[in-house]
Amino acid sequence: MKELKLAWRYVRRHWWQYILGILALFIVDEVNTYVPRFTGEITNGLDQHTLDMGGVMGLVWKIVLIGVIIAVGRFAWRFFLFGSARSIEKELRSDLFAHLSSLSPHYYNEHKTGDLMARFINDLQAVRTLVGMNVISTFDATVMLLLVLWQMMTYVSPKLTGVAVLPLILIIFGDYFYGKVMHKRFLAKQQAFSTLTDQVQETVSGIRVIKSFVQERKELYAFAKTTLFTKEKNLGVVRLQALVMPLLDLIVGIASLLTLAYGGYLAIYGEINIGQFISFNSYVTMLVWPMMAVGECITSVSQGLASLRRIQEIFDAKPEIVDGDMVNPSIQTLKGDISIEHLSFAYPDQPTVPVLEDVSVHVKAGETLAVLGRTGSGKSTLPSLLMRLYDVTDGMITIDGHNLREIPLAALRRNIACVPQDNFLFSDTLQNNIAFGSDNKSLEAVQEAAKNACIHDNIMEFPKQYQTLVGERGVTISGGQKQRSSIARALMKDAPILLLDDALSAVDTDTERQILDNLRRLRKGRTTIIVAHRISTIQDADHILVLDEGKVEEYGTHEELLNNGKLYASLYRKQQLEKELHEEGGAAHAE
């Protein structure tokens, strides 16, 4: 099974800790089985008057020594086995995080955050139990069972042992069916928990939308349905456990009754003495734990294997964008000469719907290319393809004459600074957010980048200034402030290629003008690609590419495209009209 191979890969790293822990566990179980024997010897000695006080104290001290050995041994096996389980959990979590970080954006489009979080936390805990407590319980129950049975047969009576064990054989047959059913039910339980986690995560992330549309009651009803579904799946596991445990108690109880009846018969007719009878009943009591542990072990194994399967599914997912055979490790620095040749692209989940078709354009190092088009024209796809978040379907993109597949991924992305549409900020200080991705994290450098992005003055108005903590995804600051912070972060990187994907949509025209003036000064020597809706943002670009339904509609400078009188000119006239109407409305409002 793949799942067991995955577990073994981590367990074998700690083999010596497992050996020491199991050895300590064996010693504890071994000395434990001598306590009933010594108790029986004391009983016989006192009953037959063959023991004096010195003999009694000798046996008592042996029992005390056994207690000390058990205490030390229990500490040892807990330290080694539980410690190994925690180490495996930590290693598996780190590897899982690293693997998730390597996966392509397409994977995250198909898998919900809540489901991944459930696997990352809940399933890992089940695996820790599998390689920790379950190892202890399984070995302890097996060894204790064998040692106790050996003592019962050699010290007391093989016949009495057979009678006592006969009902317990039923447990072995029941365990097989119990394990199969429990595995299915626990898998369903974990999947239900993933759905619940995802719904909570989505609700928390979208709470502002929910409140603005007054949908709290609807979301509460939907959450109640999900909670009820999760409860039913949990009860499916609980019901099975509730059924099995009393049955185990019943079988163990029957074994105890048979022991008392047949053991009493043997004692009455002199086949065993009173000390052996008492010892045997103590041994039967010691059998209760191994028998009860069987059910717990099967439950734990079923849960652990189900969780391992869910974790294995993540490891089975392979990153779609990797350094292939074409990669040239010597390419580490780029100048920014970009050539796009007959590029066509469709997203993996919609391979028959082209987003870009036969796009060709060349941008020399240090030049600025603007990309304009209606919503859905495919303009925002270009930055993703340049950073190789996706591979092109047809055609080719080269930088400095190198096919993107020849450039190591890390080197490619290190040479590109990007301001994406969503302007994601981490739940951290503004200083750390702006310095993210930059080697120079000094406050002076951060402030300089913030000034160029026209966000410095706003930051200085905050009580904690650059140490202000932004909320998750930057929700505690405005959209314009998030956008300008993202621009500052890109400027801090100081890369030879700058990508701005609708990076000024949330700022007013005056701030836009200031930022553009700063960018004109800073982008000298840098290749800049600006994706925008507003022509005012891109009219000073060296080249303007106009896309319509994924195809090149026009290409040229601002003046050339206006003279063409096509889509670009039409968009320009509409935006100029909107600007005039807005200014007239503002003037009328002022009067």
Question: Model-predicted segments: where are they?
Answer:
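ABC-type nucleotide-binding domain
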Residues: 324, 331-591
